[in-house]
Amino acid sequence: MQKQERLARLLEKANSLPLVPGVYIMKNTSGKVIYVGKSRKLKNRVSQYFQNGEKNVKTARMVSCVDNFDYIVCRTEMEALSLENNLIKRYTPKYNIRLKDAKSYPYI
């Protein structure tokens, strides 16, 4: 699948997400978790990744590897923060740097 088709498919999926707190899990073509993030509004945050526009080098590289994503709705931002932290520790995703070493504290 070409890059533009892949991004269009992912953006369409992202635009169907709810506007609630949650955690999103980016995966590559092998289904391996490459990034875990949290958001106050899942739809807004996840769709930003797949829209045209400026991205820093790390984000652009990560997006180029994303083939699919999952998400988990949370009741509160604090629940999302805790879940994000636990998932990063479980999967140690390539593009999550801040929480990998378990030395820094999670924040909203």
Label each region the model flagged.
Residues 1-108:
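Acidic, glycine-enriched active-site microenvironments
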